[in-house]
Amino acid sequence: MKLTSRGRYAVMAMADLAKNNVKEPTSLTEISLRQGISIAYLEQLFLKLRKNNLVQSSRGPSGGYVLSKPPGEIKLLSIISAVDEKIKTVKCRKESKKACNGKSIKCITHNLWDDLEAHINEFFENNTLNDILFKEVRNSSKELKQ
């Protein structure tokens, strides 16, 4: 499976926004410091996230970004798709005339990987930023008890 840093970092940055601000804009510098993602990379990601109406921006000394919707309404798949990330587990595409190995037939495990891709997409479609936040809260409270 291939999910590049672009998709992972976009989800991390959006989760950071969801966790650390409710109404006040958050600067990319703040996100960069907390998440360890370069500002230049965040600028590229947030350009696409804003274009896809997942965040709103404001300029000025107290400017930054806020989520355009509540965290429970932002699906992880929409974040990943917004930054042009495709989740692929097979080389070939269904609409392609050539199959997995460049021949006219699919490889023997094609359906396995194709089904896995469908499950991964379904997972990201069924989970929101809220799910990330609540899982983090549960995990951190477990660590405190130990």
Residues of each region from the PLM?
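Conserved segment of winged-helix/HTH DNA-binding domains
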Residues: 71-96, 109, 115-116
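Basic amphipathic alpha-helical segments that dock to polyanions
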Residues: 45-50
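Residue cluster at the C-terminal edge of the helix-turn-helix DNA-binding motif
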Residues: 51-54, 82
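Key DNA-contact positions within bacterial/archaeal DNA-binding proteins
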Residues: 40
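C-terminal regulatory/oligomerization modules of transcriptional regulators
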Residues: 94-146
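Beta-hairpin "wing" of winged helix-turn-helix
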Residues: 54-62, 66-67
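Short amphipathic alpha-helical interface segments
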Residues: 10-22
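A short alpha-helical element within helix-turn-helix/winged-helix DNA-binding domains
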Residues: 29-36
